[in-house]
Amino acid sequence: AHELRTPLAILQTKLELFAEEHPAMDAETAGLVSSLREQLDRLTALVRTLLEMSNLQSISRTDQIALAPLVEEILTDLTPLAQKNNISLQQDCAELGMVGSDALIYRLVFNLVENGIKYNRLDGAVRVTLRREKQTAVLRVADTGPGIPADCRESIFQPFFRVDKSRSREMGGVGLGLALVREIAVLHGGSV
């Protein structure tokens, strides 16, 4: 994946230079440039996620993490996306802490909440709850979307799996978000 970063950066730079040097492009060329940008962004995101997944084991997991403020930060960060579709974000989080990687736990919760927003219905809601059950912190992210078919509930955590491949372009992403969620959870002694 590292070897892909440089050529991608060069392609992105050349595409930007082309667009700047040809401001009066005809509609067909402008459409092509836009399509190339979109695909380049998707490929860059894929490479970034693959690098993150390959480096998970080497990331320090010794941060003291206050989970309720972390959830609040994530909901604040995702508010603009939620507002686009009039999705309400709700939380009911106990004051719990854990030791782990703050950056990875942020990513885990972010990915779950972002999916709850993206795959929700218009005027829906996403609710995040955090409770202690025995000696375990239990995080739940629930939304008012159509849900995940029972036969896909295990597969969604496999890399590149999409429940509805026809919506991939519309939704963005490459099908690695929930695979990353599972890897992070397992790395921290948890499960999904």
Name each region found by the language model.
Residues 35-43:
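Short alpha-helical segment of the dimerization/phosphotransfer core of two-component systems
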Residues 81-90, 96:
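Short conserved segments within the C-terminal catalytic ATPase subdomain
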Residues 116-117:
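Short helix-loop "hinge" at the ATP-lid/N-box region of the Bergerat-fold HATPase_c
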Residues 123-135:
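Short beta-strand/loop element within the Bergerat-fold HATPase_c
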Residues 143:
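Acidic ATP/Mg2+-coordinating residue in the GHKL
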Residues 148-162:
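Short conserved segment of the HATPase_c
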Residues 189-190:
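Conserved glycine-rich
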